[in-house]
């Protein structure tokens, strides 16, 4: 599916919620807006990696974020989250997108996600690694210290995490919602899989031949 067709399909299906589209309750209409198509997913992976390099984000982390959210498919969330990265509509105001339906554009959706994720990544404190022993994370199957990439993903999903972690005297007892802990676990697995595919491809970025390989740009 081309970028133009993806946008047109998403807008057409989302328009059933009314003229405001993404701004109205979507619980009755949530779900994927296109069939699961491996070719479309690969097309979007290429786009995601391009955006990540431009935004100074680890491409594999951004890919893993999209895989965790929607398996990199156009999607309308229960609370009207938009696109493959499930960006909340109110971010359109922060990013000065007019109209907010621009968030359905796959590239814009990925850029928004990259910037939100990068902001979360910058909020890391080394002591947050001890949250790996948090009861909720352990119950979700987490083992070992919490890493920075997963903390950023956890914050992407649960925006209050930096404030809650900063105020906690014992990170083991922070009341992380079970759904958020499970999200962090899925992201970590998706990140390992993304990096595993890269190693299998000799670290060649999606959409590039080995001769044109470029190094990934990490968050800064």
Predicted regions and their residues:
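Sec-dependent N-terminal signal peptides of Gram-negative exported proteins
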Residues: 2-17
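N-terminal secretory signal peptides
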Residues: 53-61, 65-67
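Membrane-interface starts of transmembrane alpha-helices
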Residues: 37, 58-59, 81
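Short, surface-exposed helix-loop/turn micro-motifs enriched in polar/charged residues
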Residues: 57, 76-79, 144
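Non-catalytic cell-wall polysaccharide-engagement segments
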Residues: 16-41, 46-47, 53-55, 90-220
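Residue-level detector of well-ordered alpha-helical segments, enriched
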Residues: 61-64, 83, 148, 152
């Amino acid at each position: 599916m081309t970028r133009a067709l993806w946008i047109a399909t998403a807008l057409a299906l989302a328009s059933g919620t009314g003229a405001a589209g993404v701004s109205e309750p979507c619980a009755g209409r949530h779900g994927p807006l296109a069939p699961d198509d491996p070719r479309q997913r690969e097309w979007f992976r290429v786009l995601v990696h391009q955006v990540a390099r431009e935004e100074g984000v680890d491409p594999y982390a951004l890919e893993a974020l999209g895989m965790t959210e929607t398996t990199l498919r156009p999607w309308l969330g229960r609370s009207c989250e938009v696109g493959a990265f499930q960006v909340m509509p109110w971010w359109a105001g922060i990013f000065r997108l007019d109209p907010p339906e621009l968030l359905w554009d796959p590239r814009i959706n990925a850029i928004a996600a990259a910037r939100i994720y990068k902001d979360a990544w910058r909020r890391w404190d080394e002591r947050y690694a001890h949250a790996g022993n948090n009861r909720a994370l352990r119950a979700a199957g987490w083992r070992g210290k919490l890493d920075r990439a997963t903390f950023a993903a956890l914050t992407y999903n649960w925006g209050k995490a930096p404030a809650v972690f900063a105020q906690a005297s014992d990170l083991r007892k922070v009341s992380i919602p079970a759904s958020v802990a499970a999200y962090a676990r899925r992201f970590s697995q998706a990140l390992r899989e993304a990096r595993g595919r890269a190693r299998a491809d000799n670290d060649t970025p999606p959409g590039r031949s080995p001769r044109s390989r470029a190094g990934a740009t990490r968050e800064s």
